[in-house]
Amino acid sequence: MSRPELTGHASIFYNAKEAKKYDSSSRMIGVQREITERAIELLRLPPASEKPSFILDVGCGSGLSGKVLEEQGHVWVGCDVSRDMLEVANERIEQKRLSAMGEGDDDESSSNEEEYDDNDVNMQSNSNKNASFGDLMHHDMGTGLPFRPATFDACISISALQWLCYSNAKDQIPKKRLTRFFSSLYQVLRRGGRAVLQFYPETAEQAVLISECAAKVGFAGGVVVDYPNSAKAKKHYLVLTFERGYKAPVGLSDTGLNQVRVDGERRDGNKRVHKKKKNGKTKEWILQKKETQRRKGKDVRQDTKFTGRKRKDKF
């Protein structure tokens, strides 16, 4: 199956038909919810009961990730390059707003009349203090984020960042678009805030390019890879912060990795001693080196009981 990014611009791929399909698929909704919950976990936000966070959702699409933010008590603003996806998101927000106001389905939704333009946020009135509604904006993230400095407490992005690695016009240079996006993100985040951007790199070089562009504008952080040995469950999360010396957390492990660790503990229990290699590259050093490569998004072979073991001397 070809990648959507290779078919053209995101605004063309996510048309009205694809937007409805995207929002009605139970599998897609479940995956989006799981990824969003993981991104919020990596943000390490204070409890919303104490103080709700103001969060920017870049590439918000049909508002599936925004719905999770609302359920956790946070306030959010979403931007996306696809008008059709925003129409679906606005319909859901409008229905929730009418339901909170007690109007239900009696009043007709005016979602089809909404216009989404750059620098124009569709503010939803909120008469119910217990309900939160997302604000939507039609905008291309590759041109930078048009918000005031230090506006947001945090930022999330689900399955959108990799689109900046592809060029659909002569003036769309991936490195420049990535740098422009990260530079503006650095400005709109409040100091002490974080950003967690989940993306699907086609190659290891794309993951390195994204990380380098983020570091160039001043961000600290790294790439967290969940389930690195799974073809379907593998997920990349770029965690960005202002904290110098920040070390990205270790990604979630799959069954295979857990099994290897259990075997390692059993070997320790048997008090098997591994002699240090002459060149200084012990098994611990090799495992640490492989883990570092995984965080950079590179393809690394799975750890086994033979990792770091000396080969037999043969003629």
Model-predicted segments: where are they?
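C-terminal lobe and adjacent flexible extensions of AdoMet/dcAdoMet transferase-like proteins
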Residues: 234-315
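Conserved class I S-adenosyl-L-methionine
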Residues: 1-50
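Class I SAM-dependent methyltransferase SAM/SAH-binding core
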Residues: 54-144
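A short glycine-rich, Lys/Arg-flanked "PGG" loop and its adjoining helix->strand segment in the class I
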Residues: 175-191
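Conserved beta-strand signature within the Rossmann-like core of class I S-adenosyl-L-methionine
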Residues: 192-199
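A short beta-strand submotif of the Rossmann-like class I SAM-dependent methyltransferase core
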Residues: 157-160
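Conserved S-adenosyl-L-methionine
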Residues: 219-230
